[in-house]
């Protein structure tokens, strides 16, 4: 993995090296187009991506592969279960889990009801914004991210 070239001075491999061997991203989104686009963008920059097309499927994959997952990218609007429920369950399974939540509507506010998230993304997701949020969520320095 090399340095990213999108207005960023980030070496993602260095940030991932601090994650105790966790290298994968779990993407939970019931929209196939959104999920595949996000996955392709992440894979392009060297991330291993695990995909789930529903909240329950995402929770099962998290349970099975928790040791590999550095971060979860969670769509808050899912057909099978509300994103807030999935978030709460992920945090119950692993209180240290890093979750970036996604929403399609700019008017939709993510309400933190005792749940902490590592970042919030609005759809459609710009690649540079995605990478910045992941970098910061994984403990990367804000000084590495140009304004």
Where are these regions (language model features)?
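Acidic, metal-coordinating helix/loop segments flanking the phosphotransfer/catalytic sites
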Residues: 51-71
């Amino acid at each position: 993995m090399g340095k990213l070239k999108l207005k960023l001075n980030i070496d993602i491999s260095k940030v991932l090296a601090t994650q105790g061997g966790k290298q994968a991203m779990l993407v939970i989104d019931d929209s196939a187009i959104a999920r595949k686009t996000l996955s392709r963008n992440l894979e392009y920059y060297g991330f291993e991506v695990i995909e789930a097309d529903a909240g329950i499927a995402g929770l099962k994959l998290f349970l099975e592969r928790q040791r590999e997952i550095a971060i979860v990218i969670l769509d808050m609007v899912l057909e099978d279960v509300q994103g807030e429920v999935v978030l709460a369950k992920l945090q119950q399974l692993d209180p240290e889990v890093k979750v970036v939540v996604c929403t399609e509507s700019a008017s939709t506010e993510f309400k933190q009801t005792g749940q902490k998230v590592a970042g919030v993304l609005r759809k459609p997701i710009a690649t540079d914004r995605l990478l910045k949020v992941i970098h910061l969520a994984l403990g990367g320095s804000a000084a590495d991210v140009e304004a």
